[in-house]
């Protein structure tokens, strides 16, 4: 269980509350969550050990054109990991719903409105693109590169989070490898609803024991934290216990409410230019 579930900054969230669905544009529906809540718990200061983005895909984006004809698109939002706030996902959904019966003059006006409002909520400039559905005609479902660590014949009896599974997990020769798991599951900090994801860990350093890494990832199964916070916890725990020279942690979560969240954290300064779906997305 997260130590900050009862933080005063979370008290006013619509998440977990009965809410009305507004179909007229209303930017005030967006709700920020300070990233400092979990970063204080991780002993992270202002100088972060990573860069990256939260990559959101907006599958239920619809509005009316100037003549009242409904329009649909798929949107992508890239929210910098350096922003003071993350955006709470239910409030994001409610905000997008408020476009549904609102007339806009152009697609560019939609993109500009999203960019302005999300930047204000996050506290730092975000990148927004919206695309027509036909742009996705030939887009394939992909799998993460590298080796999957899930097919191990091990017995697990505890599903409570424990970073100590990573103790002494990195030994031996220096390697560069990509590992991934589809068994990442945590729970919403407020509602306890399950969050399902796949995670890729790319690193250069002493080789990480795959059994210990898998046990660590499975220990998130009863853990309560937002998607972005889980990924930052994975990054900082691996850096603490395994001390790789280079590390990237990239998780892609299944969608909820027409949104998926794909946090990316790295100390290599690179971010993915694409946003390809995995099988469960």
Curated annotation (Swiss-Prot):
The gene is queF. HAMAP family: QueF_type2 (MF_00817). Catalyzes the NADPH-dependent reduction of 7-cyano-7-deazaguanine (preQ0) to 7-aminomethyl-7-deazaguanine (preQ1). Belongs to the GTP cyclohydrolase I family. QueF type 2 subfamily. Keywords: Cytoplasm, NADP, Oxidoreductase, Queuosine biosynthesis. It is found in: Cytoplasm. This is NADPH-dependent 7-cyano-7-deazaguanine reductase. One of its GO terms (molecular function) is preQ1 synthase activity. The lineage of its organism: Bacteria, Pseudomonadati, Pseudomonadota, Gammaproteobacteria, Vibrionales. It comes from Photobacterium profundum (strain SS9). One of its GO terms (cellular component) is cytoplasm. The active site is at 188 (thioimide intermediate), 195 (proton donor). It comes from the Bacteria. NADPH binds at residues 89-90, 256-257. It catalyses: 7-aminomethyl-7-carbaguanine + 2 NADP(+) = 7-cyano-7-deazaguanine + 2 NADPH + 3 H(+). Pathway: tRNA modification; tRNA-queuosine biosynthesis. Homodimer. Substrate binds at residues 87-89, 227-228. InterPro entries: GTP-CH-I_C/QueF, NADPH_dep_7-cyano-7-deazaG_red, QueF, QueF_N, QueF_type2. Its EC number is 1.7.1.13. GO terms for biological process: queuosine biosynthetic process; tRNA modification.
